[in-house]
């Protein structure tokens, strides 16, 4: 689920509008929009769902950003996926092998898996739609794997910033950076000290300009080149 409107993490997006914009028939979007759900405000200070929790819910991010994370034995963690406004987390049969935590204060629609599954099973077009969403999430996961496994520190951060700008529909102008340097480190497999150095180097090289949390892409084409960023994998 991904709306094409420009959005910031604190902007509330509509489930129905997002589904229709992504290609689902309006009548099917209406069924999902009418499904029983709770609206939950998720604070970023502690996990929303711990690793090993049942995947008995379907989630839709109305505002904010959710992160999936994997802890390690030393107490550290790797952020392995993000969900921006207009994106969601689908249920599954097995317990989750990841935790969920908000990057910023977020509003999340949470429904029961049994209600969601019943609708999907009744409507083949809905099933096909969510298969496409799962394929998109898988493609994003492959990009993240390559980013952490094969690219250098600067390329990793460049790719993350480019992807974030596109997923937030901010285009090539820049973005209000929603991440702390530690969060960027947890996403790109490096230390926060190294992330600070990379961002400073990007600014010195004339690639970006920073003012508070705002990051302006001074040279978008070069940022894309450095990060090997080709956005086709983000399409549904």
Task: Tell me the role of every PLM-derived stretch.
Residues 1-44, 85-89:
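Cyclic nucleotide-binding regulatory module and flanking cytosolic helices
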Residues 39, 82, 110, 178, ...:
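Short aromatic/basic micro-patch
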Residues 121-189:
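Polybasic "coupling" helices that flank or enter modular domains
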Residues 165-236:
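Phosphate-/nucleic-acid-contacting segments
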Residues 79-139, 143:
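Cyclic-nucleotide recognition modules
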């Amino acid at each position: 689920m991904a709306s094409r409107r420009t959005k910031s993490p604190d902007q509330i997006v509509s489930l129905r509008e997002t589904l229709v914009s992504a290609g689902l028939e309006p009548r099917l979007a209406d069924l999902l929009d009418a499904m029983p759900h709770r609206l939950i405000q998720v604070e970023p200070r502690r996990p929303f769902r711990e690793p090993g929790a049942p995947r008995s819910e379907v989630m839709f991010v109305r505002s904010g950003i959710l992160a999936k994370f994997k802890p390690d034995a030393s107490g550290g963690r790797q952020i392995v996926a993000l969900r921006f406004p207009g994106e969601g987390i689908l249920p599954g049969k097995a317990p989750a092998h990841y935790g969920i935590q908000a990057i910023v204060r977020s509003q999340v629609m949470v429904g029961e898996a049994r209600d969601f599954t019943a609708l999907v099973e009744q409507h083949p077009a809905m099933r096909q739609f969510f298969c496409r969403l799962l394929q998109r999430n898988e493609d994003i996961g492959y990009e993240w794997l390559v980013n952490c496994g094969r690219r250098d520190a600067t390329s990793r951060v460049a790719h993350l910033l480019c992807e974030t700008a596109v997923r937030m529909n901010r285009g090539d102008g820049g973005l209000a950076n929603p991440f702390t340097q530690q969060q960027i480190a947890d996403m790109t497999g490096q230390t926060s000290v190294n992330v600070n150095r990379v961002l400073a180097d990007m600014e010195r090289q004339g690639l970006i300009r920073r003012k508070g949390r705002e990051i302006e892409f001074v040279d978008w084409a070069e940022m894309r080149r450095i990060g090997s960023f080709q956005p086709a994998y983000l399409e549904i």
